[in-house]
Design a protein with these regions (language model features):
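Hydrophobic alpha-helical segments at protein termini of multi-pass membrane proteins
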Residues: 1-183
Length: 183
């Protein structure tokens, strides 16, 4: 789990770093960091949330229409149909709110991480921000991995942790943006 969280941090933050050193090297204004963070977080939110929501919507429409053949074709097996149906049955307003909290937290984190990595890419003296971003990313991802593997049973503490991490990252990134990042 630690390996997975750390790997995600390394690949995403080093990817950001390479992006700032190559594709965005001409964008020297610090606002580029915020823009890149919004783009990264926004695309992730769309791919993670929209893809699963679209699947649930198609599944629910087939279920309500009584089209079991389409469900089996979509799911591949009767067991998968039962699993998705049980999952849809647990989909409450509270779950939707937690999903929104997670996406907002992830957006704030991606904006913050982009600011740190931008500072690291623009100044050798600030390369420590890259390691900080990798570590913060891993810390952010760890509770979700613990939940997925069953070590944490409740979703609310995980989402609360993500929100706290995102707010800490945002506060730290604001300081970096205002005081330490090149204008």
């Amino acid at each position: 789990m630690l390996y997975g969280a750390l790997t995600a941090g390394i690949f995403e933050e080093c990817g950001r770093f390479c992006m700032y050193k190559t594709v965005m090297r001409r964008y020297d204004g610090r606002a580029a960091a915020v823009t890149a963070g919004i783009g990264h977080g926004g695309i992730e939110a769309m791919t993670v949330s929209a893809a699963s929501m679209a699947l649930y919507l198609v599944f629910a429409l087939c279920w309500n229409a009584g089209d079991t053949d389409a469900l089996l074709k979509l799911a591949g097996s009767a067991e998968t149909v039962q699993t998705v149906a049980a999952s849809l049955g647990k989909y409450t307003v509270g779950y939707c709110l937690l999903a929104c909290l997670e996406r907002v937290s992830a957006m704030l984190l991606h904006i913050s991480l982009s600011v740190f990595v931008f500072a690291a890419a623009r100044s050798r003296a600030k390369r420590g921000y890259l390691a900080f971003a990798i570590g913060l990313h891993a810390i952010f991802d760890m509770p979700a991995a613990l939940y997925q593997f069953g070590y944490v049973k409740q979703l609310f503490p995980v989402e609360l942790w993500l929100a706290v991490c995102a707010l800490y990252a945002l506060r730290s990134a604001r300081k970096c943006y205002l005081e330490e990042c090149d204008a």
